[in-house]
Amino acid sequence: EYWYRLARVESRLNNSNKVIIAHYKKALEEGRNISSYYAPMSALQIGLIYEKIDAFEHAEFYLDICLAMSGFDYERGIHQQAKASLDRMSD
């Protein structure tokens, strides 16, 4: 949870995408086998950052990771956001 929260704060402070992504990746790695939403939300946020900077291949990779996860709080909403991002990139 620490890395996820840190990345969220850094994102709101408009810190470097590189730093934000690195912290989301740590949250993703540490949370993969835990049933909380931090790991899938981290994958989603990484995907959204990559979408925003037009790095669509990287975005799709992380959005697919997000969609492959299940059994966590807010799953439906997080998956809807990931699918919407993939739809935007396919247009």
Explain the meaning of each model-derived region.
Residues A27-E29, S35, L67:
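A conserved position within tetratricopeptide repeats
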Residues N14-N15, D54:
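Residue-level detector of the short coil/turn that links helix A to helix B
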Residues E30, Q45, A68-M69, S85:
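Residue position in alpha-helical solenoids
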